[in-house]
Amino acid sequence: MGTFAIERTVAAPPDQVWDVITDWAGHGRWVPLTTMRCDPGPTRVGWSFSGLTGVGGLRFADVMRITDWAPPSEGGSGRFRLVKVGRWLAGWAEVSVLPVARGEQTRLLWRENIVVRPIPLGRLLGPLTDRVNAVVFARVIADMASEAEGAAGAPSSGR
């Protein structure tokens, strides 16, 4: 329930892709109707951020905490894991960047589990929210990939 996976090859090196996907304050550029709030300081294990999504007074916070943090070094692989600890959403995300094509491209692997709380409501809504999340995140990740490719000066890999 609530788990989806997206894999994408990005025409940019792993460190460039990493910089884009871990620009937590910037996630509002890609996630519709969302503004971000982040802990001060650099990202690290235990660091938290949240996406506040909605319109007007109808908003909810997706609060997340980093549980694993391993940025890529010198064109190598990187990964992070987070857990969702907010009132309305449970789940986790595991994201990896892997060098391909002599480090000129990146294989981006994004697995995420999103469950509406309370859990019985999440089970009921799961079939709908799973489809919506897969579509929204495919678009979000495509936009992130395009930004990373643009920053790297590479042609877009398409959507």
Model regions and ranges:
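Beta-strand/loop substructures that line and gate deep hydrophobic ligand-binding cavities in soluble
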Residues: 83-139, 146, 155
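Beta-strand elements of well-folded, non-transmembrane domains
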Residues: 12, 55-57, 114-116
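Short beta-strand segments that buttress and anchor functional surface loops
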Residues: 48-55, 79-86
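A short, structured loop/turn motif at beta-sheet edges
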Residues: 14, 42-43, 68-76, 96-107
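Hydrophobic ligand-binding cavity/cleft-lining segments
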Residues: 1-44, 159
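Hydrophobic pocket/interface hotspot
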Residues: 17-21, 27, 49, 66, ...
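Helix-adjacent hinge/juxtasegments
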Residues: 58-69, 81-84
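Short, surface-exposed coil-to-beta transition loops
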Residues: 3-5, 59-64, 89-94
